[in-house]
Regions:
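Intrinsically disordered or highly flexible coil/loop and linker segments, enriched in small
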Residues: 131-132, 421-426, 462-469
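A C-terminal functional module that forms or caps the active site or interfaces directly
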Residues: 397-403, 409-454
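Conserved, well-structured functional cores that handle cations and Mg-NTP chemistry
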Residues: 94-98, 107-316, 480
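An anionic, glycine-rich sequence signature occurring as long contiguous blocks
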Residues: 313-421
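A short, flexible helix-boundary coil/loop motif
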Residues: 3-4, 9, 29, 80-83, ...
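Gly/serine-rich nucleotide phosphate-binding loop at the start of the catalytic core
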Residues: 4, 26-161, 497-509
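Charge-dense polyanion-binding interfaces
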Residues: 193-201, 205, 325-326, 331, ...
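Polybasic, low-complexity terminal segments and linkers that are predominantly intrinsically disordered
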Residues: 1-31
Length: 517
């Protein structure tokens, strides 16, 4: 073909004539000339001949690394964490396994591949490792080391040469938990707490001889189903937890807040749930001295009367809206009695400055305003600067303890503020990997039992974190609790608990010297 018929192209197969292949117009020179272009993965794998480096080599002229400065911090060791877990969990196995082995529901263990203990420990270990859902518990459950770990914890015999060794799936655990009596399973949690009490774990967390129990309600989980109303979808529970100065909130008892009754058109409430919970708590611990700590919802005469009837003390948040008449009388009595003390703090120059005020009044002194007295004391705490007890805060507390001087008033205020430990616990369980508010199943019994096993795992984790991980974290203080849980999960997947016999691990010494009020 003649060149004029080819659009002045010398090559009939060329994409663009040389006339247009300049000045930035037209196609790229590589494409116009039939050259291969470097795009995507090819650009990464092949050297572009059109790019030249001033200095060839992989160092690009950088100087050789030479360490200087202070040595880096130690990294957490997953094998050491597994060894510590082995020594920690053994005494708790001896407490839990005899109690759980008889809770078999309607199944026959001899006809099943997994024993009831194996199913319990499958769920407890999943919660302990912060695997917040059934999908995460199923993710890597069939690895050999993980399966051996679950069987080691439950004590179920197994063949070490079995090539088909695996762990039960979450659906098997769910079907089993749907048949177990939740009341009987809750007694296992109670026995675990009794073991901690007998072991003197709360010796330094007692207020005038009383173990402090905070009560509060929380959303447990949400049921699925388009046929359910918004009120029926939510499962609420009232929790009673032992709180300590070092941040523990150990689950003790829980009482379900009944779902909305459409026939009676009535909704259960925390107050009615507390009446039921207090009755069970007194039956389970008839001689134990407790101090009930609650928010303003519980600051009313019926709750105080229940505490007095059970020989319990109380510290309740006192607000104007709960007992308006008494609140106004207390304010007048404070002006008349003038029982108060200034709180001080050191300023940057080394001097002393006022940082707050604490006052107290016996509600019996309100008889002048009310005509009759109230059998409790009121402590008011107000700080506008940093003090030994924390930063700025304003609060008022009603208590059954005698308050006659500043130190007792400050102590009452400090324990009243520790009610927030239970709120912190709820937040950790919701967002820290335990799965509170996550829907594990729609069955009421199984959901209740999942919640109880979560509380057992959360109790064990708090003791493990404070008594064991605090030792391991001395040189790697930036490792969070959730990261330790992941490291333990990795160690169990790779090594397994069978790689650390209890005889060689020994009993892990607990660190207790910092558990001081």
């Amino acid at each position: 073909m003649a060149s004029d018929a080819q659009g002045q192209r010398e090559n009939a197969d060329a994409i663009c004539s040389n006339v247009f292949n300049r000045g930035g117009s037209g196609l790229d020179s590589a494409v116009a000339g039939g050259q291969e272009s470097f795009e995507g993965v090819e650009r990464l794998l092949k050297v572009n001949p059109y790019v030249s480096l001033a200095k060839k080599g992989d160092d690009w002229g950088q100087q050789k690394f030479k360490f200087c400065g202070r040595p880096p911090a130690a990294q957490p060791d997953h094998a050491q964490a597994l060894r510590a877990f082995r020594g920690f969990i053994e005494p708790f196995r001896q407490i839990l396994n005899p109690l759980l082995v008889n809770l078999v529901g309607k199944r026959k263990d001899e006809a099943c591949a997994y024993s009831s203990l194996t199913l319990y420990w499958t769920v407890i270990l999943g919660f302990f490792q912060h695997l917040r859902s059934r999908n995460q518990m199923d993710m890597l459950r069939n690895t050999r080391a993980y399966s051996q770990t679950v069987l080691e914890l439950s004590g179920q015999p197994y063949d070490t040469d079995d090539t088909e060794l695996h762990t039960a799936c979450s659906q098997t655990c769910r079907n089993f938990l749907a048949q177990v009596d939740a009341t009987a399973l809750e007694l296992v949690l109670v026995q675990l707490v009794r073991y901690l009490i007998r072991s003197k774990w709360f010796r330094d967390a007692m207020l005038y001889g009383c173990i402090c129990v905070a009560v509060d309600g929380t959303l447990c989980e949400r049921k699925r189903g388009s046929h359910l109303s918004s009120k029926e979808k939510r499962r609420y529970v009232l929790e009673a937890r032992i709180v300590t100065p070092w941040g523990w909130n150990i689950p003790l008892l829980s009482e379900a807040v009944e779902a909305y009754d459409g026939d009676k058109e009535k909704q259960d409430c925390e107050y009615k749930a507390f009446v039921r919970l207090a009755k069970r708590l007194k039956e389970l611990f008839p001689k134990q001295a407790f101090c009930i700590i609650g928010d303003a919802l519980y600051c009313c005469r019926p709750i105080m009367d229940i505490c007095r009837k059970n020989n319990w003390d109380f510290i309740l948040t006192f607000k104007e809206g709960t007992m308006p008449k008494v609140y106004r009388a207390v304010q007048l009595a404070k002006q008349r009695t003038k029982s108060f003390s200034w709180m001080t703090a050191k300023d940057p120059s080394g001097g002393v400055k006022s940082a707050g005020i604490v006052s107290w009044v016996n509600a019996m002194e309100c008889a002048y305003e009310l005509g009759d007295g109230e059998d409790f004391r009121v402590v008011t705490y107000f700080s506008w600067g940093a003090t030994e007890d924390g930063g700025a805060y304003s609060g008022c507390f009603a208590t059954s303890f005698e308050v006659t001087e500043e130190n007792r008033a400050l102590n009452i205020a400090a324990w009243g503020r520790r009610r927030w430990n239970i709120e912190t616990g709820f937040r950790v369980e919701k967002h820290g990997g335990f799965g509170l508010e996550h829907t594990f199943c729609n069955d009421d019994t199984a959901g209740r039992n999942y919640h109880l096993l979560m509380q057992i795992a959360y109790t064990l984790w708090q003791v493990f974190d404070t008594g064991v991980l605090s030792r391991l974290s001395d040189r790697c203080r930036k490792t969070s609790q959730e990261m330790w849980a992941k490291l333990l999960f990795i160690a169990i997947l790779i090594l397994g608990l069978s790689s650390v016999p209890h005889v060689t691990a020994g009993a892990m010494r607990m660190r207790r010297y910092h558990l001081v009020a």
